[in-house]
Amino acid sequence: MRTSHMLEHLMEALRCLPGVGPKSAQRMAFHLLQRDRKGGLQLAEALSQAMVEIGHCQECRTFTEQDVCHICSNPKRKENGQLCVVESPADIAALEATGQFSGRYFVLMGHLSPLDGIGPSDIGLDTLDYRLQRGDISEVILATNPTVEGEATAQYIAELCREHQVTASRIAHGVPVGGELELVDGTTLSHSLLGRHKLF
């Protein structure tokens, strides 16, 4: 089926979203044009506004409309001296939803990946190094993903912490709550055994 240039352009633009291929993009475009033009206009306006007005927090690098985000500007979040290092702003949302962490964050916006040309300065480790030098951080909690790149990134940051005599800890990895051992992969099970803790 031959489509108009504008429609092709819309479908191509929609494909920038993760998990959206040609068919999904076509379905979305047709839905907006056929059934929800008002929603399409609202989406276009919201996207345009967000791309212009949402930037990065000067302290933790998460997304915010201000120079400093609401977490970093909260004096109570500084009291325990804890800094949780994550790979993306989505990780902050997940951790905040638990209600278990009351410190501050630092967002890497990725992980070390030499094969892809992503080095320490590309993920803000020079900025993190400067923050460690300031002396107001007593513990860095490494919450990078349990991938090869995430582990390598955590090890690199742990070395930075050692240089500044700041405690570094790694979030636990293991068997999910409600999970069955026979269904858990070997690597996860190994992490569970190595990260076990005493009950008495």
Curated annotation (Swiss-Prot):
The keyword Nucleotide-binding does not apply. Residues 81-176 form the Toprim domain. It comes from Vibrio cholerae serotype O1 (strain ATCC 39315 / El Tor Inaba N16961). This is Recombination protein RecR. Keywords: DNA damage, DNA recombination, DNA repair, Metal-binding, Zinc, Zinc-finger. GO terms for biological process: double-strand break repair; recombinational repair. The gene is recR. Signal peptide: none annotated. Belongs to the RecR family. May play a role in DNA repair. It seems to be involved in an RecBC-independent recombinational process of DNA repair. It may act with RecF and RecO. PROSITE patterns: TOPRIM. A zinc finger (C4-type) spans 57-72. GO terms for molecular function: DNA binding; zinc ion binding. InterPro entries: DNA_Rcmb_RecR, Rcmb_RecR, Rcmb_RecR_Znf, TOPRIM_dom, TOPRIM_RecR. The keyword DNA repair applies.
